[in-house]
Amino acid sequence: MLRGLIDRFVGRGDWAITVPPMDGALRPNQMLEEAHVAAEARAPDNLILHHGEVVFSSGRELRKLETGAVVRSFDRPIACVAAADGRLAVGLTGAEVTVFEPDGAVTPLPVAQSSCPTALAFLDDSLIVCRGSTQYAADQWKHDLMESGIARQGSGSVVLFPRDGAPRLIADQLRWPFGVLPVGDRIVVSESWAHRLISLDPRGAVRPKPVLSDLPGYPARLAPASDGAAWLSVFAPRSQLIEFVLREDGYRRRMVSEIDADYWIAPALANGRSFLEPIQGGALKQMGVLKPWAPSRSYGLVIKLNGGFEPTLSLHSRADGSRHGTTSVVENSGTVFVASKGGDVILAMPVEELVEQ
């Protein structure tokens, strides 16, 4: 307790507002901003492979990337999707997860263990469900962050649903798990508000183990790469201003109660759409130009990870770009596809043209 008080007074440890720099493999570039647009859609979110085709969620619809044809539509916005061996799992905002079988059978999962779904993945015959929070819906991620501040524990969890059998809790007290990827005998999960990736035991017998910590942004969904590595999307950047606000409980509570969420000093999927948005002095346009290194609440970032989950390559859309809010990535037939939810586009880049740093 005494150490915590001292850390708070001198601004160190959990109370430090420093943000790790983007250098080395995370050195900024314009690769997302210069990438080919594979499709334009309203707030494209979760990219997956289904029956060998790339499909994506957009609002209440699940669409094919190549043709734009609607695969399925729902009465609520889609929060997350996953597919394997003809099976399709869909999590809806403010509702539960439903599994659609190849034979036409439809299986809704228990609401108590599948509410607020943020990411899904199949593991053999089982389905892994990431629950972002017990208090908020999937589209209220900003509320969850502002409510928790820098708390060490959250209300998120990861639950395993066997095809036949009772659901099993793998991990709880997580800070907004937003991505999941089975890797061998473990499950790797992105924990957004903790800025890290953690490794979980599918049996829940071992405590979560960090595999990549102190990321410069808020990690989102994971996807396998063709070379056995992985892709990680980062949907928003960290900043010293936001880190400061997260530590000022009184200010943050008043901001949340009095100001619309779009105008909070908080991470965002897009920026510069309204004059009411908060802005730092370094983000003011000079001679009509916004510098790419200006402080921004939104950003576009995709990271390539090696087998040890170390960054080897990164793709960026910087402060002066528009392809921000990168919530999902998938690789198919030598091309990597990126969903820019804030930029309303899906981008495509040949893998062979991406040079690791």
What residue spans do the PLM features occupy?
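Beta-rich, blade/repeat-based domains predominating
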Residues: 39-51, 74-87, 112-125, 155-157, ...
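Short, conserved, GDST-rich strand-edge loop motifs in beta-rich repeat architectures
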Residues: 130-152, 235-297
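A short helix->beta-strand "capping" segment at the edge of beta-propeller domains
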Residues: 2-4, 11-43, 65-69, 304-318
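Short loop/turn segments that connect beta-strands within beta-propeller blades
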Residues: 65-68, 101-105, 161-165, 201-205, ...
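Asp-box/WD-like beta-propeller blade repeats and closely related beta-sheet repeat scaffolds
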Residues: 91-98, 102-123, 130-156
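Blade-level signature of beta-propeller repeat domains, shared across WD40, Kelch, NHL, RCC1
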Residues: 237, 325-357
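A short beta-strand motif characteristic of beta-propeller blades
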Residues: 32-39, 67-73, 105-111, 166-171, ...
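Conserved beta-strand positions in repeat-built beta-propeller and related beta-rich domains
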Residues: 50-60, 89-95, 129-142, 188-194, ...
